[in-house]
């Protein structure tokens, strides 16, 4: 009996030692399993913004040209200043035009006198015709002379009206409210009616247009996504934000007005036009800008933090995920668009997948890893709501 006890005690001691070693090995193995931060994907909706290049265009442009010829005797504006509709810009010497008006009025008076005399003669001939004191031919001649005299009165009246208009045209006015440009003529210059060169250009800059360029591919993609319900657009005006050439955001929000139905054959693009308030004149014609157009709300979107997306040697987007057995798997994905610090993934991943976003340098496909909650998971969830 004592002998059995002596043999049993060493055996129990060895067994305990082996168990302790196994537990220690398990702890060491667990400690060696790399920890990775993951984000669990869930579908949501997100506003889609298209970044488009563009240039500013005046809302209205008036190239001022004289409608009568003559000598410029006065300029009534300061270059670069605001002018209102109807303001006088130039004064053309009115003396020759006034003389033409006076001559036209004299011709009208003469025509009226001739017509009055012809009417008296015609009335007399009409009375005598009833008593056969004049021939029918004399009566017809008197009637013809009266008609010609009345026609001459009409022509003379038109000449007076035209001369009056020409005299008014001697005062060259602005047809719009806007900012005047550089004058191309000075006092003393001879100008002609409807000449090719403008005297000055007036541009209305508040509001102001921005012409944007969008590729046909993006234009068709957006139409297809709206038609299929992938993008839900709010009825009404489409808001547009603007980034200036210095990188700063323009303080006013614009709206999309229309899209040109014609494709530019040289660039393969379409033109979109937006309109912006410009009360302070910060936007000038010809400025290069970048617009952010709100395409609408994309439904059932999977957003993946940019840290979780890499590109292989072929340039294709990939992501590492943890499967249900905590084994690292490599997925090839389609990351169609970047929104902020996240990618919109359209294929290769699904809701519920755990995408690895941190600890990537410690893992490779096929090994086990231990998931820990990522701080980006909350941010990702908030962006979808």
Curated annotation (Swiss-Prot):
Lipidation feature positions (S-diacylglycerol cysteine): 21
SUPFAM superfamilies for the chain: HlyD-like secretion proteins
Signal peptide: 1-20
Major site of localization recorded for this protein: membrane
Pfam family, one: CusB_dom_1
Topology term for the membrane: Lipid-anchor
Any GO CC annotation of this UniProt entry: plasma membrane
Domain of life: Bacteria
Locations listed in the record: Cell inner membrane
Residues covalently joined to lipid (N-palmitoyl cysteine): 21
Any GO BP annotation: response to toxic substance
Keywords, alphabetical: Antibiotic resistance, Cell inner membrane, Cell membrane, Lipoprotein, Membrane, Palmitate, Signal, Transport
Lipoprotein among keywords: yes
GO MF term list: transmembrane transporter activity
InterPro entries in the record: CusB-like_dom_1, CusB_D23, MFP_Efflux, RND_pump_MFP
Quaternary structure and partners: Homotrimer. Part of the tripartite efflux system MdtEF-TolC, which is composed of an inner membrane transporter, MdtF, a membrane fusion protein, MdtE, and an outer membrane component, TolC. The complex forms a large protein conduit and can translocate molecules across both the inner and outer membranes.
NCBIfam families registered for this protein in UniProt: PRK09859.1, RND_mfp
Stated role: Part of the tripartite efflux system MdtEF-TolC, which confers resistance to various compounds.
Family: Belongs to the membrane fusion protein (MFP) (TC 8.A.1) family.
Protein name: Multidrug resistance protein MdtE
Organism name: Escherichia coli O6:H1 (strain CFT073 / ATCC 700928 / UPEC)
């Amino acid at each position: 009996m004592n002998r059995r006890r002596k043999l049993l005690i060493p055996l129990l001691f060895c067994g305990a030692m082996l168990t302790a070693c196994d537990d220690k090995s398990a702890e060491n193995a667990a400690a060696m399993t790399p920890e990775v931060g993951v984000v669990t994907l869930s579908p949501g909706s997100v506003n889609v913004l298209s970044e488009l290049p563009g240039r500013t265009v005046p809302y209205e442009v008036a190239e001022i040209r004289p409608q009568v010829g003559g000598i410029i005797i006065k300029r009534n504006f300061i270059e670069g200043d605001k002018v209102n509709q109807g303001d006088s810009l130039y004064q053309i010497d009115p003396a020759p035009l006034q003389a033409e008006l006076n001559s036209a009025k004299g011709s009208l008076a003469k025509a009226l006198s001739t017509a009055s005399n012809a009417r008296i003669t015609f009335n007399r001939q009409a009375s005598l015709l009833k008593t056969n004191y004049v021939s029918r031919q004399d009566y017809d001649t008197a009637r013809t002379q009266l008609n010609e005299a009345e026609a001459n009165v009409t022509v003379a009246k038109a000449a007076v009206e035209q001369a009056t208009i020409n005299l008014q045209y001697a005062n060259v006015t602005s047809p719009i409210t806007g900012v005047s440009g550089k004058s191309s003529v000075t006092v003393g210059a001879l100008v002609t009616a409807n000449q090719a060169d403008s005297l000055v250009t007036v541009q209305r800059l508040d509001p102001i247009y921005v012409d944007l360029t969008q590729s046909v591919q993006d234009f068709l993609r957006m139409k297809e996504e709206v038609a299929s319900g992938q993008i839900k657009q709010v009825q009404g005006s489409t808001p547009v934000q603007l980034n200036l050439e210095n990188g700063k955001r323009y303080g006013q929000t614009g709206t999309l007005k229309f899209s040109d139905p014609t494709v530019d054959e040289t660039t393969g693009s379409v033109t979109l036009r937006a309109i912006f308030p410009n009360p302070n004149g910060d936007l000038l014609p010809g400025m290069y800008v970048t617009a952010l157009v709100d395409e609408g709300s994309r439904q059932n979107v999977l957003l993946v933090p940019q840290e979780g997306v890499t590109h292989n040697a072929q340039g294709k987007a990939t992501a590492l995920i943890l499967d249900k057995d905590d084994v690292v798997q490599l997925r090839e994905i389609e990351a169609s668009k970047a929104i902020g610090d996240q990618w919109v993934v359209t294929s290769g991943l699904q809701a519920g997948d755990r995408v690895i976003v941190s600890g990537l340098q410690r893992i490779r496909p096929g090994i086990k890893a231990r998931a820990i909650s990522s701080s980006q998971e909350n941010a990702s969830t908030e962006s979808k709501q």
